């Protein structure tokens, strides 16, 4: 399941000039790009096409979560944009995820279909507060089982959950890990974080990295250092 660059740079920009200047500094041979809600809402589908025209594969990180037909049609639209990866919330349930898988089977281009388990910003206390009487790790495990049995290609998870998920779901199940920070970087707002080398060792397939690259004085150098660390494992 793993192929191509394993580092995915999160583009958290709202200013087009800053975005263009930043992307121009990156090498599509070293990374893929993640387009999230802020960027997509600000610039629309055209930004995906423009990034792809620069040679980058795009992870469309919109975390779709709705009734089955609505979510499936959104995933179909993402496939029509030619994205490399798209995600939905596993908590949307089996019928929703199966509807998304079924609609992609009819498309000439099918992106990787990934389920979000629990957001990496949530602590165990917050997970209990919103109504799940278990730890983050337990909830991730339950949702990952549901996702795989519903036809998902993999899940988004913290690298702290990756070893257990890798053992439980096999080598072909894709594990996409945000919350990646080089050792010297601050944790920012993601509670469950690990370094790139540790994440790969623990079984992660792809690493989502944001601020350590986007806020670096030399983004390409920061990217190269992370890629080097990943390839050293």
Curated annotation (Swiss-Prot):
The keyword Cell division does not apply. Substrate binds at residues 12, 34, 61-70, 120, 181, 190, 210-211. This is Orotidine 5'-phosphate decarboxylase. Catalyzes the decarboxylation of orotidine 5'-monophosphate (OMP) to uridine 5'-monophosphate (UMP). Pathway: Pyrimidine metabolism; UMP biosynthesis via de novo pathway; UMP from orotate: step 2/2. Homodimer. The active site is at residue 63. The gene is pyrF. Gene3D superfamilies: Aldolase class I. It comes from Hahella chejuensis (strain KCTC 2396). GO terms for molecular function: orotidine-5'-phosphate decarboxylase activity. Keywords: Decarboxylase, Lyase, Pyrimidine biosynthesis. One of its GO terms (cellular component) is cytosol. It is an enzyme of class 4 (lyase). Its EC number is 4.1.1.23.
């Amino acid at each position: 399941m793993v192929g191509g660059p394993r580092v995915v740079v999160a583009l958290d920009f709202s200013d087009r000039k800053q975005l263009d200047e930043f992307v121009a500094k990156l090498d599509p041979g070293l990374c893929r790009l993640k387009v999230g809600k802020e960027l997509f809402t600000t610039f629309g589908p055209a930004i995906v096409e423009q990034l792809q025209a620069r040679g980058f594969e795009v992870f469309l990180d919109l975390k779709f979560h709705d009734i089955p037909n609505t979510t499936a049609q959104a995933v179909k639209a993402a496939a029509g944009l030619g994205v490399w990866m798209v995600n939905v919330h596993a908590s949307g349930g089996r019928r929703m995820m199966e509807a998304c898988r079924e609609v992609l089977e009819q498309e000439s281009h099918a992106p990787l279909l990934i389920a979000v388990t629990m957001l990496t910003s949530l602590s165990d206390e917050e997970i209990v507060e919103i109504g799940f009487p278990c730890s983050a790790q337990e909830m991730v495990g339950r949702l990952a089982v549901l996702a795989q049995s519903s036809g998902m290609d993999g899940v988004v998870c913290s690298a702290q959950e990756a070893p257990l998920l890798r053992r439980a779901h096999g080598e072909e199940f894709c594990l996409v890990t945000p919350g990646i920070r080089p050792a010297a970087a601050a944790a920012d707002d993601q509670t469950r974080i690990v370094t790139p080398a540790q994440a790969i060792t623990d079984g992660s397939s792809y690493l989502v990295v944001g601020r350590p690259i986007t806020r670096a004085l030399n983004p390409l150098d920061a990217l190269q250092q992370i890629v080097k660390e990943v390839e050293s494992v």
